[in-house]
C-alpha cells in the first residue's frame, strides 16, 4: 500500500504521484468528489486503478495511503 501525493497541476487537473515508483499520472476519474466525501476508486491516465479510503474533501496537496484496486 504505497503513500501517494495528490495535487492539482497548472491546468487544474488532479495528479497522482507514487514516490516509490517515481511515477506521476493524471487522475481521469475519482469515485467521490464532493465536500462531504472525497476518495474511493481512482482511475489514472495509464488505466491503473487505486483505492483511497473516503474522507471529507481535503486541501491539496495531500499525501495518503492508496492500495491497488482489487487487492485484499
UniProtKB/Swiss-Prot annotation:
The gene is nifT. The keyword Protease does not apply. Keywords: Nitrogen fixation. The keyword rRNA-binding does not apply. InterPro entries: NifT, NifT/FixU_barrel-like_dom_sf. It comes from Azotobacter vinelandii. NCBIfam families: nifT_nitrog. This is Protein NifT. GO terms for biological process: nitrogen fixation.
